[in-house]
Amino acid sequence: MEKDGFKFWIDRLGFNATLFDVIRIDHFRAFDTYWKIPATCPTAVEGAWIEAPGYALFDTIYKQLPNINIIAEDLGDLRPQVLQLRDHYKLPGMKIFQFEFPIYPDGSGRMPKPISPTFVENSVAYTGTHDNQTTMGWFASLKAASQEQLAIFLKPFTGTVAEQLIQLTLQSAVKFAILPMQDLLSLDDTARMNVPGTIGSPNWEWKLKDFSAFETMIKKIKTW
């Protein structure tokens, strides 16, 4: 790809930029290092980490597409170089509240100090994504001690837990907030979009069939 000036990426991102105001690139870590697997291997177990030409790629992207807006999906266990690459180009990363809130696996103990999600300005905040439980489902799955701590943390806000987290997200310092429809409607896990690592029903089957509740929620959001 580097030999032809990253034509694949320039064409792909350039076309997407005609359709969308902002483009999220998943698995951003692969622009730092990627897992190379021999074509003869039946699984992905055998392979090696290869350093990617991330800086050369993004230099080319911004030279040819200077007005493009990109979000870097920077979740998971990352080496520092991934974040350095992200920050070099001032790309907003992702913050998901469900990952920011500390959970006690056994439900015991109390927080030693008030919790605060690390939502910084140059990031995009989510209550959850398509791969998460809905906020209502996630809260229901927490142990009592964690539920109590979350309730204390969200005390300044009103409504369902999902509505409270939405208010927190909208009032944070982030550049963008992305809210799943299921959280806007305070739906439980029966409306979950996807369970990573699984196939078949009910993944990707949920549909919004009635806009009336959503329209009511939009009016409420305007007051927040």
Show which residues each predicted segment covers.
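Glycine/aspartate-rich loop-and-adjacent alpha/beta segment that forms the canonical ThDP
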Residues: 192-194
